[in-house]
């Protein structure tokens, strides 16, 4: 089994419902077991900032799927929940990013792991470190909390459904 860390985000429609539906679909993946989920955080948009706020969270799983097969499964979940890729960093019903896939490193057109922007995004690192505070980034094994210490965290708040 390979330990996998995911980041989930949404800024369209009923955001909390999209996260819940994505989690339910992830729970149904073959040869995969859900281990832990973070709290949900509300954040301003990153990259293209003129859009609605996001809800973000992290998930820890273990799987026997290959990284390529796991990516196909997560993309199928995104598509089933109405994800349309119009523009980079645009609004989305759901975004499921593979942050870490065990100690493996991938740099292909389809899959880049560790996720290339994760160390620049507090909205990724805060929920991820909630799951595993001593998590290290392969292959250099630098603590992820050291990256977080250098980032602005002022626009990230714990989400509470009203």
From Swiss-Prot:
EC number: 2.7.6.3
Pfam name, any one: HPPK
One annotated GO biological process: folic acid biosynthetic process
Catalytic activity field: 6-hydroxymethyl-7,8-dihydropterin + ATP = (7,8-dihydropterin-6-yl)methyl diphosphate + AMP + H(+)
Keywords: ATP-binding, Folate biosynthesis, Kinase, Nucleotide-binding, Transferase
Top-rank lineage group of the source organism: Bacteria
Pathway annotation: Cofactor biosynthesis; tetrahydrofolate biosynthesis; 2-amino-4-hydroxy-6-hydroxymethyl-7,8-dihydropteridine diphosphate from 7,8-dihydroneopterin triphosphate: step 4/4
InterPro entries: Hppk, Hppk_sf
Keyword Chaperone: no
An example molecular function term from Gene Ontology annotations: kinase activity
NCBIfam families: folK
Main function: Catalyzes the transfer of pyrophosphate from adenosine triphosphate (ATP) to 6-hydroxymethyl-7,8-dihydropterin, an enzymatic step in folate biosynthesis pathway.
Entry's family note: Belongs to the HPPK family.
Protein name: 2-amino-4-hydroxy-6-hydroxymethyldihydropteridine pyrophosphokinase
